[in-house]
Amino acid sequence: MNGEWIGIDVACGPDVADDVAAELAGTFGVSVEFRSTGIRFYLDAGSAPHDWRTTLEGILREMGTRRFPGASFPYSVSTLAGDDWADGWKAYFKPLRVGKHLVVCPTWEEFAPDAGDRIIRMDPGRAFGTGQHETTRLCLEWLEDRALQALPSAPGSLLDVGTGSGILAVAAALLGFHPVQAVDDDPEAVEVAAENIALNGMESAIELLAGTARQASGAFDVVIANIQAIPLVGMASELVRLTAPAGLAALSGILVEQGEVVKSAYRDLGLLPRKMRTAGEWCLLEFKKP
């Protein structure tokens, strides 16, 4: 890979980074890195649309007027040699241990697991979670802890709402949750999740559904959703309905400052708030259904 690459850094806060990343990834068909100051993505200088800058500025302008009124999204551009880009990009994505025994590992990396490790094979792509984001790590750690707490029994059934890359569903199946359903209303997310489920040999262990949580059938011992605060509030009644009696709901994608709003919405529908986990500005809320 000897051509040049265009590196684009977009400054944005953590409360909007997922939305900005998803919009840009969908438009340009690229992988997006989450960084402390915002997001970064790359375009092949040889094949990038000639009007990529106009397209980018239009997206950012629209997001700052309609989606997030008053917000601004400044960006900067750098040029990288092909070899530098390839090496740097792969250097950024190394095997990532989350919790005690979950390891998210890119397919190009060789990894010698420790006893008891469960390997999630997943390459970065199209802005969906690969374990780098704090909320994904919070959810993975919670799933592992829940599976350990259930021993010697199996941890029960699980529904992953807004599955994205499918990483939480794959982790759940590896940890012994059964049956596992995963649902997403974004067609691209469903495509990516299907690829990752197959990559991990989990086609028979995970039922993947296209649509909203309403497409899920039954009630689950665990409902997990790593989305955002506002959508979580909007779908509260549906997620409460899908949580089995004595079951747990684990909700993330929530800024710490938004935690009380989400907690109130689910408490008002009868769920009992239990624990809150935090990582940086983000939190995971755990509820139990009586």
From Swiss-Prot:
Top-level taxonomic group: Bacteria
Binding site residues for S-adenosyl-L-methionine: T136, G162, D184, N226
Cytoplasm found in the keyword field: yes
Reaction(s) this enzyme catalyzes, per UniProt: L-lysyl-[protein] + 3 S-adenosyl-L-methionine = N(6),N(6),N(6)-trimethyl-L-lysyl-[protein] + 3 S-adenosyl-L-homocysteine + 3 H(+)
Keywords of the record: Cytoplasm, Methyltransferase, S-adenosyl-L-methionine, Transferase
A Pfam family this chain is assigned to: PrmA
HAMAP family according to UniProt: Methyltr_PrmA
Purpose: Methylates ribosomal protein L11.
Protein name (Swiss-Prot/TrEMBL): Ribosomal protein L11 methyltransferase
Source organism of the structure: Syntrophobacter fumaroxidans (strain DSM 10017 / MPOB)
